[in-house]
């Protein structure tokens, strides 16, 4: 496909997305404003700002990174895009950060004034001095989330390219894993691999966690040196044209797992493979998570870390001490993509469900992460109240032997298809 053909395909995809959204929104008859957002200043850093990323709801319907822009929809007249002019000073210091095709942003006020008395709702980033019906906006967002969860061909093509860059980054970093190498050095290698293979940026702050740091779910890399016999957990991904990849692998620093590490790794891998197999259209994601929690609980019983019935251990929260998060989340336009809860469903406070990020039936076109993990976090397992509460379900003598173990997580991105699924990140070895 030539560059011109690709641009035409993107244009057609945007038109299809807008038509699909129109069919949802027209019933409400609401004027909709979708803000791209503005650059965010870095506190105390003079005129520096964080790298700009347009709000995902705006980007989805424009494919533009335009600071300060607003996409407007009037069911009676269609779509309009209002774009700020780029000043001479901005061109001097930063160049043309975006194209200016569209209606001048100064015309948004008069455009709204001509629609005075009609209901207006805002999506995307907040638009100063513009009205918004909050309740209607929530309904519009629910409709948009439902559409956005199903990835079209352009989105999937970008996600595959992000996955390719991610695969290249892991391939570049893994040979450097050795005692005496710092977490930061591994971050440099993996992210350089992303960029060398076409990534625009990283999908999120890379997690490089060695030794006990691997028990911290979102540990940021430091100058800590990897120790012989330890584990190192790498959770990182590339972004391409707004679309993200999110992968985790866990490696033995010295090249081979110890017996204890191998047993826990085999359990996590077994749980992940079973969860991926369950990822099919029509299956409730909550059920995939709960089945994984049961598998973890039974595996910890078999390994001698827990005692009792697996179902009871999940319900009582004993297994959540070691598997504290959900099985995954939506991924795509952003590392955590469009809303994962159906209307009328809310988060549960049950120990095994507190951090569940998706509660809906899977559909073809959804892309989710599947990322079970088992951790031995000292701040949890050394808490006297937790030890007292779970004295009958946790075999503390066995658990205490794994102080400093850290944790193991394995994560892949799974596309739901008619009749099955496809693992987009299968090119990154995990055994």
Please give the residue ranges for each predicted region.
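Active-site neighborhoods and metal-handling regions in enzymes and metal-associated proteins
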Residues: 1-431
């Amino acid at each position: 496909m030539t560059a011109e053909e690709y641009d035409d395909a993107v244009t057609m995809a945007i038109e299809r997305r807008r038509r699909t959204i129109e069919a949802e929104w027209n019933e409400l008859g609401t004027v909709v404003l979708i803000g791209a957002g503005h650059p965010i200043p870095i506190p105390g850093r003079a005129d520096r700002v964080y790298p700009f990323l347009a709000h995902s709801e705006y980007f989805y319907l424009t494919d533009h990174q335009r600071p300060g822009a607003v996409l407007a929809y009037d069911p009676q007249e269609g779509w309009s895009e209002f774009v700020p002019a780029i000043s001479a000073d901005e061109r001097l210091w930063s160049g043309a950060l975006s194209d200016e095709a569209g209606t001048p942003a100064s015309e948004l006020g008069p455009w709204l004034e001509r629609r005075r008395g009609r209901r207006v709702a805002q999506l995307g980033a907040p638009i100063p001095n513009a009205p918004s019906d909050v309740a209607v906006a929530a309904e519009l967002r629910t409709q948009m989330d439902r559409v956005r969860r199903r990835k079209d061909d352009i989105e999937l093509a970008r996600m595959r390219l992000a996955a390719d860059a991610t695969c290249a980054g892991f391939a570049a970093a893994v040979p450097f894993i050795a005692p005496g190498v710092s977490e930061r050095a591994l971050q440099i290698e993996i992210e350089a691999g992303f960029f060398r293979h076409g990534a625009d940026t990283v999908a999120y702050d890379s997690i490089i966690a060695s030794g006990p740091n691997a028990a911290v779910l979102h540990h940021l890399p430091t100058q800590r040196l990897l120790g012989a016999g330890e584990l190192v957990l790498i959770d990182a991904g590339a972004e391409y044209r707004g679309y993200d990849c999110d992968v985790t692998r866990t490696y033995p620093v010295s090249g081979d797992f110890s017996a204890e590490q191998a047993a826990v790794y085999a359990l996590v891998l077994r749980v992940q493979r079973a969860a991926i197999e369950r990822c099919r259209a029509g299956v409730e994601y909550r059920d995939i998570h709960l089945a994984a929690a049961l598998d973890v609980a039974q595996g910890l019983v078999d390994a001698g870390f827990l005692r009792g019935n697996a179902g009871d251990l999940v319900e009582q929260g004993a297994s959540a001490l070691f598997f504290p998060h959900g099985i995954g989340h939506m991924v795509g336009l952003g590392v955590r993509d469009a809303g994962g809860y159906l209307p009328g469903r809310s988060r549960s406070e049950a120990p095994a469900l507190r951090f569940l990020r998706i509660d809906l039936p899977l559909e073809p076109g959804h892309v989710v992460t599947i990322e079970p993990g088992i951790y031995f976090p000292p701040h949890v397992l050394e808490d006297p109240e937790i030890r007292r509460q779970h004295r009958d379900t946790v075999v503390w003598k066995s658990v205490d032997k794994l102080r400093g173990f850290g944790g193991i997580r394995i994560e892949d991105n799974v596309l739901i298809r008619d009749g099955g699924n496809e693992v987009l990140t299968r090119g990154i070895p995990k055994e």
